[in-house]
From Swiss-Prot:
This is 4-hydroxy-tetrahydrodipicolinate reductase. Its EC number is 1.17.1.8. Catalyzes the conversion of 4-hydroxy-tetrahydrodipicolinate (HTPA) to tetrahydrodipicolinate. The active site is at H148 (proton donor/acceptor), K152 (proton donor). It comes from the Bacteria. Disulfide bonds: none annotated. The gene is dapB. PANTHER family: 4-HYDROXY-TETRAHYDRODIPICOLINATE REDUCTASE 1, CHLOROPLASTIC-RELATED, DIHYDRODIPICOLINATE REDUCTASE. It is an enzyme of class 1 (oxidoreductase).
Amino acid sequence: MILNKIKVVVAGFRGKMGSTAVQMILNAPNFELVALLGRKEEVSEAFDVPVFNRKEELENIEADVWLDLTAPEVAYENAYFALEHGLKPVVGTTGFTEDEVARLIKFSREKELGGLIAPNFALGAVLLMQFSKQAVKYFPDVEIIELHHDGKKDAPSGTAVKTAELMAEERLAHHQGAVDEKESLVGARGAVLEGMRIHSVRLPGLVAHQEVIFGSKGEGLTLRHDSYDRSSFMTGIALGIRKVMTVSELKYGLEHFLDL
């Protein structure tokens, strides 16, 4: 028997990511599922834990970690609520603004609580971001193409934005392409972050994919990561749940918990 299991609340348990995460937690010997947050009328399985409609109903729940796999419009409020009530948020929802992330980090320090916002929980995607940060030192001309299922609400993806932010730390911002470049269709060249172009693709059949394409005189370099199903995110989610128990402030990016 394993003592001191980490007690986890899952918000957004009815989504594809959420339902996969619930099964991972139920099967993990060191985790204990203690509550679910979502619409009760959507519950079709028999769960042995309480299901709540509103986060306020969880104020007195005994838990360690709040796993949030909801939607961009509620994830910030959920993470703040978790910290406010002594739970460590592990958030896989993307779409946070820089200001929202900064406010949550500040609040977590005040509460001395660990936490994690991860643009991507797939370990390969985290490595892709780190490899891109290294490559851009030598290939400063770069564009990002991110591809996701057509149910994804935010664009560009949090992974693409995080990748660009990391590369911007090593790359001088500059215009990429012809100086007199003109778009015959608005948006044809994609979004711009620090002079880097980001292109978003949304199609049925996809899960989560990203290419970082570097170009230089006479050569090119392409880095790519593919998540073929949502099981690819479970190792990172489990790692995040364990690691937030060991820190006293919220971290932005799973790389903070890897030996990179």
